From Swiss-Prot:
Ribonucleoprotein listed as a keyword: yes
GO terms under cellular component: cytosolic large ribosomal subunit
This protein's name: Large ribosomal subunit protein bL25
InterPro entries xrefs: Rbsml_bL25/Gln-tRNA_synth_N, Ribosomal_bL25/Gln-tRNA_synth, Ribosomal_bL25_b-dom, Ribosomal_bL25_C, Ribosomal_bL25_long, Ribosomal_L25_dom, Ribosomal_uL5_bac-type
Biological process per Gene Ontology, one example term: translation
Keyword rRNA-binding: yes
Native source species: Phocaeicola vulgatus (strain ATCC 8482 / DSM 1447 / JCM 5826 / CCUG 4940 / NBRC 14291 / NCTC 11154)
Physiological role: This is one of the proteins that binds to the 5S RNA in the ribosome where it forms part of the central protuberance.
Assembly, per entry: Part of the 50S ribosomal subunit; part of the 5S rRNA/L5/L18/L25 subcomplex. Contacts the 5S rRNA. Binds to the 5S rRNA independently of L5 and L18.
Family in the record: Belongs to the bacterial ribosomal protein bL25 family. CTC subfamily.
Length: 198
């Protein structure tokens, strides 16, 4: 998995007025949930801010990254956990990061990449990707940049379900019956099948 560095500044004032002022100046309020726990057993949270520009390459991309967070000079390995967007302008309102514990598995969404020319496509069908990303659970250093699904032997009207896939070191979290991709019958393929059946 690729890594990306993001520089942030610790926030001392996290009130509404300060947050509004921060956003007005093209800053994004962020929270890092650490591996350390507080007295209630909850992850210790660090509030910090990042310039909007500094988040673009992380947010607006099909790729997944380990984030090297540089908060006032302190480097922490983290993953992007959640983003809130403005409902009208799509501006980034808030970002949550989780610090990586190298000894514990993390859950991430990994892009799916279809490989091969499906038999069903050669027969006139259309290949449709239903799930663009799959949720995986694994140690962060074994999570790939993408999950490759070989569709070469996929026939007309056939599907690939999550339960049919397996990757070394990864646990797939999605429902086993969820359809990842399918070769759908087109009008031309239906016509050809009807003609062949006569």
């Amino acid at each position: 998995m690729k890594s990306i560095e993001i520089k942030g500044t610790v926030r001392t004032d996290v009130g509404k007025k300060a947050t509004h002022e921060l956003r007005k100046n093209n800053g994004v309020p962020c929270v890092l949930y650490g591996v350390q726990k507080d007295e209630n057993g909850l992850p210790v949270a660090t509030h910090f801010s990042v310039p909007t520009e500094g988040l673009r390459n992380l947010v607006y991309t099909p790729h997944i990254y380990v984030v090297d967070l540089n908060i006032d000079g302190k480097i922490v390995n983290a993953i992007l956990k959640d983003i809130q967007f403005h409902p009208v302008t799509d501006a980034i309102l808030h970002v949550d990061f989780y610090q990586i514990d190298e000894a514990k598995p993390i859950v991430m969404e990994v892009p799916v990449q279809l490989e091969g020319l499906a038999e069903g496509v050669r027969a006139g069908g259309k290949l449709a990707l239903q799930l663009r990303k799959l949720k995986v659970k694994a140690l962060y250093n074994v999570i790939p940049e993408r999950l490759v699904v070989d569709v070469t032997s996929l026939g007309l009207g056939k599907t690939v379900k999550v339960g049919e896939l397996s990757y070394e070191g990864l646990e797939l979290i999605n429902a086993k019956e969820a359809v990842v991709c399918a070769v759908k019958l087109t009008r031309a393929a239906r016509g050809a099948a009807a003609t062949a059946g006569k």
